[in-house]
């Protein structure tokens, strides 16, 4: 009886430790989609040098993180995120998930990016489990940032016993940047 109790306690502790999440600052991982590395804030698209020469509406839109994504690799069974929205945007014609949520994609063996799930925001400060109960194997991820809001901070949560590291695959390739400028139809927010 005593031996069974000890085994139960050990198993309970192992599963409890495994279930805990550890959060890692996303600024430690590659950020895709910025015009330049010299932008003022980490999750803004334009450098501060453009502030005084840009129209105010354009400058304000540049503070949204649309088109930007974080790349990382992990063997975690759970991926979570903590983030603070810059403006806490709400729109009548779009859900908060579309405006200030996050979208997680996983790189498949055939080279395609597959949608995993969205992190649905509850307010300005958020903590969401994006996916859980996965098989523990190394995967490449891309976490897309909010379309119509910016970020103050972002952390990625993984199992306490899992690894999280720099991506091994340089994909999408970033050698020759392409700039798109247009309306929300181009962005995909409205049609």
Locations of the language-model features?
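A generic structural micro-environment signature
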Residues: 7, 162-164, 187, 191
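N-terminal secretory targeting modules
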Residues: 19-177
